[in-house]
Amino acid sequence: MPNAKLRFLVLVKYNGDAWRKLVDYPEDRWKAVRPVVARCGGNVIRKDLVFQGDYDLAATIKFPDAECAAAFYMAVMAGGAVSDMKVMRLVSIEEGMRVMGMAGAAKYSFFPPSPPGSRPAKRAQAPERAGRRRR
């Protein structure tokens, strides 16, 4: 899917100065942020204020790739009004199930490394086949 856009969950925490200005002069800051999103190749799908929890704003934004999402993150953080921000790739349930299937096919048995100076850990032996006798 070369032209598909990836969805990202964006969580934003304003700093105290930004909140002070928003309380004194309420405004929709997304009017200022939308052009930044667009210059990074994205478009806002949904945005909401969050009044409980660690973040103040949650948004779903589509970007062409992770580099565009990273550029958006850097641009916003450089602006000075945000003290913390998370940008996380979202996947649909269907995509997640495909990934789970891939992980199941690729899994291996993990055994921790041996401490220095000790004998290497023994790998689990495959069970003997039924009907085969040991001598």
Identify what each model region corresponds to.
Residues 13, 58-62:
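Short hydrophobic/aromatic beta-strand micro-patches
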Residues 62-95:
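An amphipathic, aromatic/His-enriched active-site/gating alpha helix that lines ligand/cofactor pockets
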